[in-house]
From Swiss-Prot:
Places the protein is found: Cytoplasm
Gene: tpiA
Protein name: Triosephosphate isomerase
Positions of the catalytic residues: 96, 168
EC numbers on record: 5.3.1.1
Homology family: Belongs to the triosephosphate isomerase family.
């Protein structure tokens, strides 16, 4: 079901103690407020169980930032979708541009992660996006549609409907650059059109598509006002309640 969502992505930040304090501070800040979106925080693996136990998870959903593409076994250092689910987390970020770039995660790998997440009752937040060279070459629509198609279009309609998508213009992450609200809307509409062509309009119109590129308190309201922008996947600003809360309240 299509929802407004603001999801934080802490990346590789915060010790366990710092993360627990931040999650509790956010939980306290949201208590008693009227919030018009679902709030999720994506944290490093070591935080998941402690945070899920310490906050009201009906108020704030907890997400892992990744999971393994294997079910279990001799994969030293990996964390399976089943392990993530056992912590009390309900979501997992898959396919973030940093995972694609630094750890060479390809569509076949991401497809396995999505399937394992779904089979363990997790909701994937699946990321797609183009780099600057692809946008400047006019290939951005083609690239993003292909990322969606290659990793997700083997899913049946029921499973696809469980996904949250996030569009991250890679050239706008951590650079201070932001896609304009019109650029975001244009790409989100293109993604939704691609979904409709495969699964039909009902599934496409029921899919939440978040914007994930340097979204902050100053631009969130304008971005979220666009018809196909259903919220944000927030990086740096999610590390501070003072910066994250105004984005949540932009709806």
């Amino acid at each position: 079901m299509r929802k407004n969502i603001v999801a934080g992505n802490w990346k590789m930040n915060k010790t366990l103690q710092e993360g627990l304090a931040l999650a509790k501070e956010l939980d306290a800040a949201l208590k008693g407020r009227t919030i018009n979106c679902d709030v999720i925080i994506g944290t490093p693996f070591i935080h998941l169980a402690s945070i899920a136990a310490a906050i009201d998870t009906t108020r704030i959903g907890v997400a892992a930032e990744n999971c393994a593409d294997k079910e279990s076994g001799a994969y030293t250092g990996e964390v399976s979708a089943a392990m993530v689910a056992s912590t009390g987390a309900r979501y997992v970020i898959i396919g973030h541009s940093e995972r694609r770039a630094y750890y060479h995660e390809t569509s076949p790998i991401l497809m396995e992660k999505v399937k394992l997440a779904l089979s363990n009752g997790l909701t994937p937040i699946f990321c797609v996006g183009e780099v600057l060279e692809e946008r400047e070459a006019g290939k951005h629509f083609e690239v993003v549609a292909r990322q969606v198609e290659e990793a997700l279009f083997t899913l049946d309609q029921t499973d696809f409907a469980k996904l949250i998508l996030a569009y991250e213009p890679v050239w706008a992450i951590g650079t201070g650059k932001t896609a304009t609200a019109d650029q975001a809307q244009e790409m989100h509409a293109h993604i939704r059109k691609s979904i409709a062509a495969k699964y039909g309009k009902e599934v496409a119109n029921g899919c939440s598509i978040l914007y994930g590129g340097s979204c902050n308190a100053a631009n969130a309201k304008e971005l979220f006002s666009r018809a196909d922008v259903d919220g944000g996947l927030i990086g740096g600003a999610s590390l501070s309640v003072d910066k994250f809360l105004p984005i949540i309240e932009a709806f």
